[in-house]
Regions:
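Ordered core of a single globular domain
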Residues: 71-171
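Structured mid-domain segments that build the active-site/substrate or prosthetic-cofactor binding neighborhood
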Residues: 1-118
Length: 171
């Protein structure tokens, strides 16, 4: 865990790797939940810093000058690659996903045997995974302190700029 297989560097906390030939849904979910907790800490901290710097350098001074009472501050969050995560977890849960590793034991690919429900097709099985993912991650966000006690909100967008991020990280 926490290893960037494309650049071959440890980029997050080291975690015991999954060593089985096939991905086990319960094992993956347990590790994935831990990683979401770790990521929520970093994500909220970075967004807090961004909001602080906006205030420090008067990024929104003109807009805020128009508000003459207590303003409702929001804290916008999102999940890049949401549909891909849902499809990946669905494949692990409903099909068989063989983990292909290189000579050093690093995952380099996956081989899916069988079919699985995909996100966006009105299949309640995929929708259940999507609902769990969004609720779980957003609950983790809400449990953290936000700058100026702003209220977290979230959106799930499928935008093409996220493709570039995935290519850079091997996703």
């Amino acid at each position: 865990g926490g290893f960037d297989e494309k650049h071959r560097i440890q980029c997050g906390p080291a975690m015991q790797r999954i060593t089985s030939e096939y991905a086990d849904y319960d094992e993956v979910i347990e590790k994935f939940d831990w990683w979401m907790d770790w990521l929520a800490d970093i994500y909220v901290n970075v967004l807090n810093l961004i909001h602080y710097m906006h205030d420090k350098y008067y990024y929104e001074a003109a807009e805020m000058a128009l508000i003459n009472n207590d303003c409702n501050r929001s804290f916008a969050t999102g999940i890049a690659g949401f549909s891909h995560v849902v499809d990946s977890l669905s494949a692990i849960k409903y099909a068989k996903v063989k983990i292909i590793r290189d000579e050093e034991g690093i995952t380099k690919d996956f081989q899916i045997e069988g079919d699985f429900p995909r996100y966006g097709n009105d299949d309640p099985r995929a929708d259940e995974i999507a609902t769990w993912l969004l609720r779980t991650f957003f609950d983790k966000i809400r449990r953290r302190h936000t700058y100026r006690d702003s209220k977290p909100s979230t959106s799930i967008l499928t935008i093409t700029s996220n493709v570039v991020y995935g290519e850079a990280t091997g996703a």
